[in-house]
Amino acid sequence: MRTVACAVLLACFMGCLAGAWAQSAGLEILPNSENQTKPIGRSMLLTCKPNVTNKNLISQLRWTDPSGREVPFKNPTLLKPHIFVDWLPPPGEKVLTLMIPELREADTGTYTCSALYSNTKQLSKSVHVRTIMPITWDDAPEEQYPTVNETFKIRCRVSANPPAIVNWMRDGHIVETGDRYVVEQDGLTILNVTEMDDGTYTCRAIVIATGEMALRPIRVEVHTPPQMSGALPPKLEAVEGTDFTAKCAASGKPVPRYTWIRVDTARDLTKDGDRVSADVLLGELRIREVRPEDAANYSCTAKNAAGTATATVEVTVVVRPRIGRFDNISVASGKDSEAVLECHATGSPLPAVTFRKLSNPNRYINGIQPTEDRITVDGVDSPDGRTRIGKLIISNVLRSDDGLYECIATNKGGEVKKNGHLMVEFKPSFADTPQKEVWGWEQHAVNLTCLAHSIPNATISWHFNGADLFRGREGQELQQTGYTLFGSGPRSTLQVIPFNRKMYGNYKCTATNKHGTAVHEIMLREARVPSAVLQVKMDVMTATTVTFKFFGPGNDGGLPTKNYAVQYKQDSQGWEDALNRTWPVDSPYILENLKPQTRYNFRFAAQNEVGFGPWSSQQTHTTPRISAPEEPRLLGLPLSATSGTENEVVVSPYPNRYELRWQVPADNGEPITHYSVKSCPVEKYDTEWRLLPYPCQEHKLEGQATTFQLESLQPDTHYKVEVRATNAIGNSVPGQIIVRTVKDPSQMPGVANVEDGSEGQMSSAAIVVLVVAALLLALLVVDLVCCLVWRGGLIAALCHRCCSAAKTDDSDAKIASLYSWRFPLPYCSNKEDPAMLAPAKMQQATVKIPVIEEKEPLRDGKEPVPIIKERVKRETAVDFDVKKSVSRTSFVGKDSAV
């Protein structure tokens, strides 16, 4: 009994507990709001989950739409379903979502989530979905283009739910309905648009219920229709064969595009890119290589969004002149003769025709010429009016009128030229035959030449003693006469080989053409060898050479003297053993390879084309003994011992070198072993060249040298150069020359110029500088030793002054203490030295170092050359500044390169 009661009580308790659980079970929808508001076009997600203790007791969980239909699960076959449900993971949580990817206005309503709990209790929860429409720009282009002087509405049509309020702003200010503006629901109307209305307008839409606001900036650009600027004239001319361009210019906004039309054919030239074309952007009509058929009316149309404008131009073609005929003519010269040159020219417009002679740059003028009344220029038009005939009329034609003439036709299209020839015929003339006398001799061929000028060419015949030399003579008979003919006109040469004296005489050359005859005479004379030489003088004689001067001969035999000859032998020889030497006229007459101290016999003769004349003017001379060579002749301006003017100075083109050249002198019986070249810097005093106190350069050249390169010279300096030849006997008299080098601004004084690989030599001034520098360095070392050991000398004095100054200046002492570790001065003592503390300033110490001047004179073998005058001498000293440690020399030569 007690057990039954306990069971009943337990059952009652469990029933009460189950009822309490069932009563608290429910569904929860997230977002947790009974009303959901979403804009149309947005996505939406509603989540339904059971709010129970045991979710396994939930079944039949689903969503229904406002129509009561169950919302299906997502169908994989549909790419984009409008509305569907899906489980959220994990599956055991039983969370069912309602998804709407894109809300529509028809989706407004109540959506219900329901479920069955414990198979007995129905659970449900609802949410109301309300859609709103955001501000949408239905017709509000961001760029709009009104036309000037017209009424234009700036469009701005807006849709929204709830409806939006629209107003306008410009430059931050509200635009209200006024004189020229009318604010409407779908736009802003502007009355009588002007260019000042350009700018940015803002269309503002407001929904007060939702607090939404949207702005749409609209750029307004006022367009103006095209207007021709007047750059295109009504008529234009194009020149045949050239490129033609016509430009059509119009103003407007936006920039207009252009179209060119040929009016007579209505052809759009912008679509034809061949020879005739048009540029739609630049408005240019282009015609390449204009032809006559391009003449027409052309229309240009400028067009933009605001309208069009048209202009028409008439293009005429200028046809270049052409010369069709300009014939060559022939006219005989004479008092009553007349020459007419006709030139036929065409072109549009008809060209003007004139002439000129090619040998004269000036053109003839129309009518009678002011400087030559024989010449007239005239012209007429052809009967059809398409040709201009120009005429050049020359009366009383002269031979000088012969030549080329130029016809010149000119019009707007340009100028064209053509040459024609006027041939003036005349009888023969021997004006250009210079031969009047010819010399010949036995068995020697001589040419007699005639040149006959005539038009037409003349035929030439030869006569001697009144007979025609070649009439009736041919072949072997003609050759036996000694005459040969080359050419019969207009140039003819008669070759004569005289074999007897009867062939000398007067020959006549006769030229004949249809206008007349001319005769020219040439005298053939007999030439002989020259007569004896009038006089021969011995000019220079050395041990091995002799130089002659010739005078004569008295009679050259009819031909100029070509050579002089000498026949010479030793006194002990006969003339059959004599030697000969021949020189051309006006050459150096030097006989070489003679023996020293030898007696020679000489005789002389002259030679022309015929041969040598008789030997004459016999002389006897004895060559001197062997001696030193002759003076070398320098190839340049020789030094004069008396004048010494600046014009006698040879200028080197280089600042530091000079190429010296000379002729090989006579060795006077002994071969030249070597040459000596010496160069010394000099300066001119009054009329003399004096040596400067600088070292000279000497060079010895072995062998037969004839050139030498003087190097290491100073710029802008005069040098006296000597060349001596030496043989076993001794030295020759020196050949002398003065050379001046050019200036070289890039070279520093005292520095040797090193150019072309040459090494400079150190001058005496440079040596002085090096010696002074070495002395200064030695003094500095000695003073430093004195400072370190005995604390005396210049360095010690300077150090003591620094230290004593540090005592008197506290700030300087502090600074010195900071740096004392960096610059230890063991010789810097605080001990005062009265001598060092003297207030007097230190004076510069000057050390006089004499410099020995080189006074080696150039010698000519006898007396020394004057050196330097006393007034030119300078004292040389070196100044040493103990404060600045700088040395300098007080010597500066007047013309010294250092």
From Swiss-Prot:
Pfam families: fn3 (PF00041), I-set (PF07679), Ig_3 (PF13927). The keyword rRNA-binding does not apply. Glycans are attached at N35, N51, N149, N192, N297, N328, N447, N457, N580. This is Fasciclin-2. Keywords: Cell adhesion, Developmental protein, Differentiation, Disulfide bond, Glycoprotein, Immunoglobulin domain, Membrane, Neurogenesis, Repeat, Signal, Transmembrane, Transmembrane helix. Residues 1-22 form the signal peptide. The lineage of its organism: Eukaryota, Metazoa, Ecdysozoa, Arthropoda, Hexapoda. It comes from Schistocerca americana (American grasshopper). Residues 23-764 are extracellular. GO terms for cellular component: plasma membrane. Residues 783-898 are cytoplasmic. It is found in: Membrane. PANTHER family: CONTACTIN 5, IG-LIKE DOMAIN-CONTAINING PROTEIN. CDD domains: FN3, Ig, IgI_4_MYLK-like, IgI_VEGFR_like. SMART domains: FN3, IG, IGc2. The keyword Cell inner membrane does not apply. Neuronal recognition molecule. Involved in a pathway recognition for axons during the development of nerve fascicles. SUPFAM superfamilies: Fibronectin type III, Immunoglobulin. Disulfide bonds join C48-C113, C156-C203, C248-C300, C343-C407, C450-C509. Residues 31-124, 134-219, 226-316, 321-423, 428-525 form the Ig-like C2-type domain.
